[in-house]
Amino acid sequence: MKIFSISNQKGGVGKTTTSVNLAASLALNKQKVLLIDLDPQGNASSGAGIDKLTLNNSIYETLIGQETINDVVRASEDNMFDIAPANQSLAGAEIEMVNIDHREYILKNAFKTLKKTYDYILIDCPPALNLLTVNALAASDSVIIPMQCEYYALEGLSDLVNTIKKVKKSLNPDIEIEGLLRTLFDRRN
């Protein structure tokens, strides 16, 4: 099983679009895929056809210890891949996670039960360098960094790379940057 985080603390760079399309592409190639929506906006969930307003269980419940990952996973609307959906309740997860021992490893520990179930787990990260993102990085083998083709995108990239280095040093020595993915490319610029 290979675990990828799709991460960039800058919003609007194509993390969710990349995550959903990569999940669908891998599924079309006969791979068993789980998409984790770790963004409180829940757009990956919407993209997978999940109604965020009627969710009973989401990744939030897994992060705060109320449900296992297996309890929150459901099929995407088209049954191509599975998803652990998110909604606005995820915005409060960090406050509740603060008092949990080894809180940086909640996702990593949750994934242990999935080893033989999926070929790939893709984590759509929030647009922030917060505890949710640290959880994703601590659980991942690799990071894909979607990045707009513009000068200011480089400023945020160094912050993300430094965070990944810190995670590699203290939480996950095996994590690697898989690569940068140029998004929103305009030949005129």
Language model features with spans:
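P-loop NTP-binding core
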Residues: 1-189
